[in-house]
Amino acid sequence: MAKIGVEPSLTDVQEALKERGYDVVPLRGEQDARGCDCCVITGLDANIAGIHNIVTSGPVIEASGLTAEEICQKVEEKLR
């Protein structure tokens, strides 16, 4: 199953993805995103200056305003 990086504060999302069989890893830093098929972030760490390092080629989903179920659906859509 796909490896999904999820920010540690999104515990409900982590649990929902685990229930669906995904390999969930906490995103505590840039290194944690390496090798992930998809990442889920809160959006609070968005780089305002637009300068960032690309460490994953997979999709990144911003969780703000979405339920855990909606995020799971987005992950599944992106990984198709």
UniProtKB/Swiss-Prot annotation:
Signal peptide: none annotated. Pfam families: UPF0180 (PF03698). HAMAP family: UPF0180. NCBIfam families: PRK03094.1. Belongs to the UPF0180 family. This is UPF0180 protein GK1051. It comes from Geobacillus kaustophilus (strain HTA426).
